Amino acid sequence: MLETLGVWQGIADEAQPVTEIEITDSSLEAGIRPVLLKYENRLTEDGGSEPASHIVPATALERALQASVASDPVLTVIAPAEIARFTDTGSSVAITLADGTEITAALLVGAEGRRSASRDAAHIKTVGWKYGQTAIVTTIAHERPHNGHAIQHFLPAGPFAILPLPGNRSCLTWTEDADEARRILALDDAGFLAEVDKRVAGRLGAVEVVGPRQSWPLEMHLARAYVAPRYALLGDAAHGVHPIAGQGLNLAFRDVAALSEVIVDAMRLGLDPGSLQTLGRYERWRRFDSFMSAAAFDGLNKLFSNDWLLIRAARDFGLGVVDRLPELKRRLVNEAAGMTGDLPRLFRSERL
């Protein structure tokens, strides 16, 4: 999608291809963490292969998207800005910003994240729950090269992922019990590095924390509706999922591609892009897929964020079986890459 939109070339130099994903399941104290499942490059339809995924710094993605928007003469950026209220007038949506500026449009899209103010103003309720877990993210430099390998350690408190970045650097993202996370985040630099060392387990040689510590509480929420008259939700405003599979951004991209396709198709047919008839197609397309993804990630978190002996034995057996079935692994890699199901045209490298 990013290539089709002409954005990828502004990101490629900072993107790290992931050529292999290793999955382990063990306790924090285990000195040896055997690899139970290994994914390699994703097979393409023409019989070739490409990286299973890419790790892209958020700053690089934001910079490339902002540059693309700034270079388009038909787009007007009003930022920073906050919506005070909006009203469906029947033929348009009347939007009033906090500074009093008034805007009229055919459609308003709520994409401002989990705490979406526009979603609340549209009276769209959500359903969900808190996990009692906290995500911790930082960046490390390390002695040994990662060779483009991503590692997912399933530990009793939750997954610990080592995601490769350009050079001898990696992004760490791990899930901890909320109380334990508070303890870890309050440590001094030496104490925090010791916690990192325990989890990296010598895999990358000597390590150094080179990025800030970031954290946020984990929860799941799903909007009860994705659309209202002249209003549509997408991304985290529509669905907040557990990061166990790292698919939150990819789900948002699918929303963007699907909504764009629905709007363009409607306008080509002379239809109203903000009508419920038009927006209903988007909701039918994306709501069920997002629900199934959220349910799957929720189930994976419950399955792997515990240390029950019987459950561990069963899940390790299951991972071993998957590792021995190449076709199933291929399907799972394509699923993780967001390349299955009813794909929008932008996901098939087709322009709208």
Model-identified regions with their sequence ranges:
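Residue-level signal for inorganic ion chemistry
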Residues: L2, L65, I162
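Acidic-histidine catalytic/liganding microenvironments
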Residues: L5, D72-P73, L325
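Conserved N-terminal helical subregion
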Residues: I11-A121, W129-T134
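A general structural signal for well-ordered alpha-helical segments in protein cores
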Residues: E20-I21, A58-E62, Q66, Q133, ...
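Conserved FAD/dinucleotide-binding core of flavoprotein oxidoreductases
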Residues: R33, K38-G47, L155-P217
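Central beta-strand plus flanking loop segment that forms part of the substrate or channel wall
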Residues: R115-A150, N168-S170, E176-E180, V196
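FAD/FMN-dependent oxidoreductases across multiple families
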Residues: E180-L276
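C-terminal helical "tail/cap" subdomain of flavin- and related membrane-associated enzymes
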Residues: E261-L352
